[in-house]
Amino acid sequence: MLALVILSTGVGLVLLWPSRDAVDDASLADQFAVEGMTYPTARIDAINEGECEDQSAVSDDPAFSGQSVVQHCDIAEVTILDGARAGERTTVQLGGSLTASGLRPDDTLRLMSLSDSAADDQEGGLGSAVTENERSSDGVLGVVRNVPLAILAIVFIGVVIAVGMLRGFLALIALGFSAMMVIYFVLPALIAGGSGTAIALVGASAIMVVVLYLAHGVSMRTSAALLGTLIGIGLMAGIAQVAVSTTRLSGLGDETSNVLASMTSEIDFRGLLTCGIIIAGLGVLNDVTITQASSVWELRAAAPGLTRREISVRAMRIGRDHIASAIYTIVFAYAGAAMSVLILLYLYDQPMLNVLTQEDLSIEAVRTITSGIGLVLAVPVTTWIAAWLLPPAVSPTNEASGARPRLR
């Protein structure tokens, strides 16, 4: 059965692997790039309080009707570090999230810079989008965070290897493979307009096959966990498909999705949402299944005379405890990720049921519930599979003589 699933996954990868032409056709780079736009880095020399071009505005949201929305801005004096303008000093406006990010002198920004000549060339095509003021100023694309992110990554890798040793190192290799699958298969296939559910099923299955065998070794124990994981993935896919359809979710629950929808018509956003639900549930699902399989094997090693049924019953007691903690993990993870949304909806002062039916919060609810159902069902499935694959019990006579079942 497992061999058939692995073979089907390989066939699915071949059939769903996106062509380079399809991805290029859907790419946004050529369609929305502005000729002459450069992205130099710049060091902050000083930050001064300033005013936005539109310091305040009246909100169009009926929940905040008549209330002014104050926009605080700072002005940063910066020195451009690279490109044709290296060494040049200029000023940029810091608004929105940049004012709350704790920027200080010597921090590095990524700028958007359009030369005067390029602005002249683009003026005919962009109409009034390029003004005289915009030609002589630079915008901030974001903060350069390479160094702190690299330090965090190094610390993470060091801790994993120090504690997990060889197993930890193999887990990092497996994590790298997972990232490659997402970058080179899942994302391009979604961009090319493929089915989100099919892409998630094939991609998640391929990831789990490699990750489990690489991180935990090739054994019957790992195979039991893999079978349980693959069944859990299938359950999550089916539940997610039904949940997204019946709750009438569009998949456009955040600003990024709406911006993306305005730029391309190739992506199926409901499929994208379904794919995201499945991929997001992989980690905790894998955690539960590998733990259950290990519990079954350790119970057999500790009590070789127990029958498969007795081991299944005892392993399910362990599994129920794991289910409780895993459910908390899922709920708190999604609640933490959606904290800003929760605060915003709280400020609306609406009944809780009304709040929960908003698209952005409904998406989080569907993600949590779908992952939770798949996780809970994977526990008994994995337990039964692992117990079925166990070597038979040792008779009391053989157990007294020190005989032990052969475990792998």
Locate each region found by the language model:
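Membrane-entry signal-anchor segments at the cytosolic-membrane interface
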Residues: 1-6, 146-152
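Hydrophobic alpha-helical transmembrane signal-anchor segments
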Residues: 1-18
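Extracytoplasmic/periplasmic regions of membrane proteins
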Residues: 21-145
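Short juxtamembrane and helix-loop transition motifs at transmembrane-helix boundaries
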Residues: 112-114, 126-141, 156-168, 186-192, ...
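Transmembrane alpha-helical segments that form the functional core of multipass membrane systems
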Residues: 154-259, 267-274, 280
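Pore-lining and gate-forming transmembrane alpha-helices of multi-pass membrane transport proteins
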Residues: 225-233, 262-279, 325, 329, ...
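Helical hairpin unit composed of two closely spaced alpha helices linked by a short loop
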Residues: 282-349
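Hydrophobic alpha-helical transmembrane segments of membrane transport and translocation systems
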Residues: 333-408
